[in-house]
Amino acid sequence: MKKLTAMLLCLAMLFAFAGCGSKDTSSDKKSDGKKVLSIEEVEKTVPATIKKVEKDKFKIGLICLHDENSTYDNNFIQALKEAQKDLGLKDDQVLIKTNIGETDACYTAAAELADAGCNVIFADSFGHESFIMQAAGEYPDVQFCHATGTKAQTAKIANFHNAFASIYQGRYLAGVAAGLKLKEMIDSGKITADKAVIGYVGAFDYAEVVSGMTSFFLGARSVCESATMKVTYTNSWFDIAKEKEAALNLINSGCVLISQHADSEGAPKACEEKNVPNVAYNISTISMGPNTALISSKIDLSLIHI
């Protein structure tokens, strides 16, 4: 029964995200009544100010807060490479800048990419937004897309856009998996119901992090009603030592399961060391946590780049 439940949950996550990222070109109605536009219909919504570019002259740029060592940034990098493959772009048509802080360095990187001929430029960190908006104002012929941002609708800059997925939905399902594990631990007598305490390692107390942890907790409570959750912030998107320390502190305080919204492998590795179940983000942690990895939530960002 447990294996069947786990399989059904995995299928639910698969179809949930497949539905968000389907490449089907047919126009249809979703179950919630919203229309899924075909590629042809989407093209009609593109502003006339966006100029068409020949494929062999097209360039795309990506600005990352960290590099491949960050699970979050690596997800963007690998997604862009997947999009490159799908679109048939050459290596010199894809430019990636890594370790670009949430400072004027971001504007400089964006300007350099624009000067290098990029037609579309992505930036992946919340704190990049104001600098990307500045660049968008100075390079009106370049499209700037910012992940996790909030200002595109109000800024009214024609070539500035926000792009991300509703990851809180995936976090809810990941929370269900966590709740199933807690219930299993209670039913087996490993813990009592009042000890079903989750630890959550967050990067910052931003709305994106708070909405994600809230969805995760609601998912867990939908299965394990006695579940409670402790949250700690590292005040950094990527810090292996801080994230590991935060996870260890939560475990030492009585948390029997750990999840995270931070970008390193610190928390999953702490869980494996302490034999505590872990729900991860951005990557599968099965290889580094063969005894403790439960499930991960991840966005297929290649669809955004395409």
What does each model-found stretch correspond to?
Residues 19-30:
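Bacterial lipoprotein signal-peptidase II cleavage site
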Residues 36-54, 59-79, 83, 96-106, ...:
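Extracytoplasmic "Venus flytrap"
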Residues 62-63, 115-126, 143-147, 252-264, ...:
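Periplasmic-binding protein-like
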Residues 80, 171-227:
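An alpha-beta-alpha
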Residues 92-114, 232-251:
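Structural motif
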Residues 140-164, 283-293:
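Flexible loop/hinge segments that line or gate small-molecule binding clefts
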Residues 207-254:
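Extracellular/periplasmic Venus flytrap/periplasmic-binding protein
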Residues 304-306:
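Conserved small/polar residues in nucleotide/adenosyl-binding loops
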